[in-house]
């Protein structure tokens, strides 16, 4: 029973209302044994206008199946002593669980951001450089014009006008605020810019100076903001395991730690984009 209770607490705290992870298409119902089976849909059919030749030549559609194991996220256990639990004026175990939920959420968010940001520039996955003036750190600032360029790329790719999301990095949020504070404040009020719903988070994805996504965890390259169409990205939650383990003989208290299975990624290499800070 404790296992189910603590798993429910972790899950309830994992998707706060302000999190951009809520924008991803939930595929929880497709998870089985901590794996998810997806199909990448084949090419769209050709449309012929005012056809005069019958019958039309049929074409086959080839779909590709993908079996995807969910990533495993483990928190290192926290030791709560019997004395601490008795002498604190709050439920220390519940506080520790909330802390583990926040840590899991942060790590899963970083993984999701890295998976969603495209590897390099293409018509279906635009990766654009910033074009503003030197922001003082040797990089060009993000401008509102850059966001309009991204909008045009999405429009030319015929992506839906609804369900577009952009996740700004802190540097790019600062750039927009400096360029036009009143306009920025209006964006934060409406939550929209250039047709994109706006979020801001320190997601850590970085690119090279030529626009190639760098390895996960890179910290010395170019920061970026990334964007996506909601219908083109997914998230899936698997099992959440963990409960307080009483360890009286050696720890005089409890150990709390959790394991969560989760993945977030694009359905296909389409409908995702990034804007990276270009060298000035």
Predicted features, each with a name:
Residues 1-66, 272, 276-278:
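N-terminal "assembly arms/tails" that initiate or stabilize quaternary assembly
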Residues 32, 36-37, 148, 152-238:
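Extended oligomerization regions of viral-like shell subunits
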Residues 46-49, 88, 175-178, 265-267:
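Short helix/loop capping segments that flank catalytic or ligand/cofactor-binding pockets
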Residues 59-98:
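Long, hydrophobic/aromatic-enriched structural stretches that serve as scaffold segments
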Residues 83-156, 274-280:
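Alpha-helical scaffold segments that mediate packing/assembly in large oligomeric complexes
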Residues 223-255, 259:
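A structured, mid-to-C-terminal "fold-capping" secondary-structure block
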Residues 244-280:
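Extended, compositionally biased alpha-helical segments that mediate assembly or anchoring
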